[in-house]
């Protein structure tokens, strides 16, 4: 693999698509293609000392490679852009070169920024014009099933400007007044209705023009890209997520991810 994209077959469109900017960039043109952007510049301090979070090993393979393969597993995704740490693009390129990746998918590595939002913007800037649907995926969600990826893409194709996979909450959630110092008691101010709450996952899918507009307009710090689209006053829709698309943030998450991966390899030959 080189820095230049490898040739890949054109994405095959479904029978009918909604006529949105995500699917038809202009009258008479073929449907827009789908790319995935993976910001992988974070350090992941909650996992403890060691390599950056995206480069931590899972089943002997860096989590980033698992995340890249998860995006490429969808036949709709023909390009994956990995946004590396500002000083680590060369290392990430070498990492991708050293692992088997699908030949039908192109892979590009670009240096990231100081913040996640800046890194996603740099990933968007690297996309060729024919890509009108964009997935943004956390490198720390290495085990997302391909059915979830495809469900997000399908919802964007059907006309949604922004789509997030999500799962119902198992725990009751309390809204609190934050304590003045860590460890102090925090007063509860509300208990949201759990049936109306969802835990959001990735990949999140977008009409490209909508996501570019959001990143060019919203300057507040946000925890995900869909929140930026919400601030534009546009609709964000939820599709079913998956319990295995959890985020590896703490050491216990890594233990769970190892168990899930071991079960897949035993049962599915993954």
Swiss-Prot record:
Coiled-coil ranges from the UniProt annotation: none
Marked site: Positions MEP for the nucleophilic attack: 194, 247
Residues with site note (Transition state stabilizer): 46, 53
CDD domains: CDP-ME_synthetase (cd02516)
InterPro entries, sorted: IspD, IspD/TarI, IspD/TarI_cytidylyltransf_bact, ISPD_synthase_CS, Nucleotide-diphossugar_trans
GO BP, sorted A to Z: isopentenyl diphosphate biosynthetic process, methylerythritol 4-phosphate pathway
Pfam families reported for this sequence: IspD (PF01128)
Domain of life of the native organism: Bacteria
Region ranges (Disordered): 1-33
EC main group: transferase
Low complexity composition-biased segments: 7-27
Signal peptide, first to last residue: none
Pathway it works in: Isoprenoid biosynthesis; isopentenyl diphosphate biosynthesis via DXP pathway; isopentenyl diphosphate from 1-deoxy-D-xylulose 5-phosphate: step 2/6
PROSITE patterns: ISPD (PS01295)
Catalysed conversion reaction: 2-C-methyl-D-erythritol 4-phosphate + CTP + H(+) = 4-CDP-2-C-methyl-D-erythritol + diphosphate
Protein name from the UniProt record: 2-C-methyl-D-erythritol 4-phosphate cytidylyltransferase
Lineage: Bacteria, Bacillati, Actinomycetota, Actinomycetes, Kitasatosporales
């Amino acid at each position: 693999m080189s820095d230049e994209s490898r040739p890949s077959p054109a994405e095959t469109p479904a029978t009918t698509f909604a006529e949105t900017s995500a699917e038809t960039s202009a009258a008479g043109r073929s449907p827009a293609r789908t790319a995935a952007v993976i910001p992988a510049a974070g350090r992941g301090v909650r996992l403890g000392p060691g390599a950056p979070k995206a480069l931590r090993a899972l089943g002997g393979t860096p989590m980033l490679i698992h995340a890249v393969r998860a995006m490429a597993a969808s036949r709709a995704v023909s390009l994956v852009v990995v946004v590396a740490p500002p000083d680590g693009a060369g290392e990430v390129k070498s990492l991708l070169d050293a692992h088997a990746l699908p030949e039908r998918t192109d892979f590009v590595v670009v240096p990231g920024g100081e913040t996640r939002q800046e890194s996603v913007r740099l990933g968007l800037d690297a996309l060729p014009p024919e890509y009108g649907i964009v997935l943004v995926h956390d490198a720390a969600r290495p085990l997302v099933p391909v059915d979830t990826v495809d469900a997000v893409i399908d919802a964007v194709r059907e006309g949604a400007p922004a789509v997030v996979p999500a799962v119902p909450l198992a725990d009751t959630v309390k809204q609190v007044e934050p304590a003045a110092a860590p460890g102090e008691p925090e007063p509860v101010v509300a208990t949201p209705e759990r049936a109306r709450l969802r835990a959001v996952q990735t990949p999140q899918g977008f009409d490209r023009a909508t996501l570019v507009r959001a990143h060019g307009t919203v300057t507040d710090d946000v925890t995900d890209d869909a929140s930026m689209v919400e601030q534009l006053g546009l609709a964000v829709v939820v599709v079913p997520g998956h319990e295995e698309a959890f985020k590896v943030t703490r050491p216990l998450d890594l233990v769970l991810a190892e168990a899930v991966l071991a079960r897949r390899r035993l049962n599915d030959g993954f």
